[in-house]
Design a protein with these regions (language model features):
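Conserved AMP-binding A3 loop
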Residues: 89-116
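Conserved AMP-binding/adenylation subdomain of ANL enzymes
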Residues: 112-129, 139-179, 192-193
Length: 213
């Protein structure tokens, strides 16, 4: 954000068709990707996208970020000094129900407002422990209050690796989670599995349920 880079957050469920459409529209210069996830070789997909889209100058495996030396990279002489509240902070994606997901520009002020007041409405503070079980590339999990709202409130924030029911239950017990957000199907899976696992969930104070009818 500080240097003016505008992230485009793709969902783990996006395949080559969706990713190709997103890249053609956004024209990104970089592509940060996990190497493999749930048996899918995302690094190989990124290599194909880079070959088909010259705009992608660098493919960066997320697992190697901490070991990379960025000092040798060429940087523009004039760095983006300070973002304006009206500038685009992030490009989120539509649901893609009509085909390729569309890019939706969200300004800094928009996201700051969302994360602040969602966190306040959920009663989050520095004593909260927030579990982020689902992909943060979805707006709700990112700032409703989600990851950004949790950090804004000063809460301890725990990110699941795969978001399975057993991982969620274990994380709640291990980190004494106080608040989390799930979709109904995942919540039902957790309730069913808890009958077998019997984790200590006494710390849990609030569950947000998204997409419920």
């Amino acid at each position: 954000f500080k240097i003016g880079v505008i992230p485009v957050l793709a969902m783990p469920s996006h395949g080559m068709r969706e990713l190709s459409g997103i890249v053609k529209t956004a024209q990104p210069k970089g592509f940060i990707v996990i190497e493999t996830y749930h048996g899918v070789d995302h690094l190989a997909e990124a290599a194909v996208l880079q070959k088909e889209n010259p705009c992608i100058e660098k493919v960066i495996p997320a697992e190697r970020l901490e070991q990379m030396d960025f000092s040798q990279w060429e940087l523009d002489e004039e760095l983006y000094e300070k973002p304006c509240s009206r500038d685009t902070a992030i490009l989120v994606l539509s649901g893609g129900s009509t085909g390729i997901p569309k890019l939706i520009a969200r300004p800094h002020a928009d996201y700051l407002h969302l994360q602040k007041y969602c966190a306040l409405s959920c009663g989050m503070d520095e004593n909260s422990v927030s579990l982020i079980a689902m992909p943060v590339t979805h707006c709700w999990n990112l700032c409703g209050p989600g990851l950004l709202g949790s950090l804004f409130a000063g809460a301890k924030t725990v990110l699941c690796r795969n978001g399975s029911a057993d991982e969620i239950l274990n994380c709640i017990e291990m980190h004494e989670v106080t608040t989390m957000a799930l979709v109904p199907s995942l919540l039902r899976a957790c309730i069913s599995l808890q009958d077998l696992m019997e984790n200590d969930l006494s710390s849990l104070q609030m569950i947000q349920i998204g997409g419920a009818r």
